[in-house]
Amino acid sequence: MTYLVSLFLLGLVLGLVAVASNPAPYFAALGLVVAAGVGCGVLVGHGGSFLSLVLFLIYLGGMLVVFAYSAALAAEPFPESWGDRSVLGYVVVYTVGVVLVAGLFWGGWYETSWVAVDEFKEFSVLRGDTSGVALMYSHGGGMLIACAWVLLLTLFVVLELTRGLSRGALRAV
């Protein structure tokens, strides 16, 4: 299980490097889907199966709509891929940066321990992630509304950024 979670963490870092190099909206959306999938795999590896499923469905339902709009509006005739020289340079720079930061923190990672959500499941009636969902809806209602507002604002920002010099995404048909 440790090897599987380590593989998921490596996939998460590679997915985020793929997003940060940002060759074209098509490939950046693919990198985000990979990063979200393996990030939810990390959560499943630590016992948060319900939380990871909810986060993945929210991501696929909400943010991919924004990337579908931006990919449709930024239709490039020849999009840059990860094999191009400029994009490959960014990938190398980000990978070297991740390796340097990991080397900086390498010595102290074993002093703290990661524990699963249900570490003492024999003594508990509730699961940790499902009771957290109930707490989010009871006391976190204001934050939930604020997050929905920020997602709507993000949609409008992406639509405004991809309009270019023309009238943009909000033009009359």
Swiss-Prot record:
Database matches in Gene3D superfamilies: NADH-ubiquinone/plastoquinone oxidoreductase chain 6, subunit NuoJ
GO cellular component: mitochondrial membrane
Keywords: Electron transport, Membrane, Mitochondrion, NAD, Respiratory chain, Translocase, Transmembrane, Transmembrane helix, Transport, Ubiquinone
InterPro entries: ComplexI_Subunit6 (IPR050269), NADH_UbQ/plastoQ_OxRdtase_su6 (IPR001457), Nuo/plastoQ_OxRdtase_6_NuoJ (IPR042106)
Membrane in keyword set: yes
Location of the protein in the cell: Mitochondrion membrane
Membrane disposition: Multi-pass membrane protein
Domain of life where this protein originates: Eukaryota
Residue ranges of the TM segments: 1-21, 24-44, 53-73, 87-107, 141-161
Keyword Nucleotide-binding included in the entry's annotation: no
The reaction(s) this protein catalyses: a ubiquinone + NADH + 5 H(+)(in) = a ubiquinol + NAD(+) + 4 H(+)(out)
GO molecular function: NADH dehydrogenase (ubiquinone) activity
EC number(s) stated in the UniProt entry for this protein: 7.1.1.2
Main location group: mitochondrion
Role this protein plays: Core subunit of the mitochondrial membrane respiratory chain NADH dehydrogenase (Complex I) that is believed to belong to the minimal assembly required for catalysis. Complex I functions in the transfer of electrons from NADH to the respiratory chain. The immediate electron acceptor for the enzyme is believed to be ubiquinone.
Family membership: Belongs to the complex I subunit 6 family.
The protein, known as: NADH-ubiquinone oxidoreductase chain 6
Gene (name only): MT-ND6
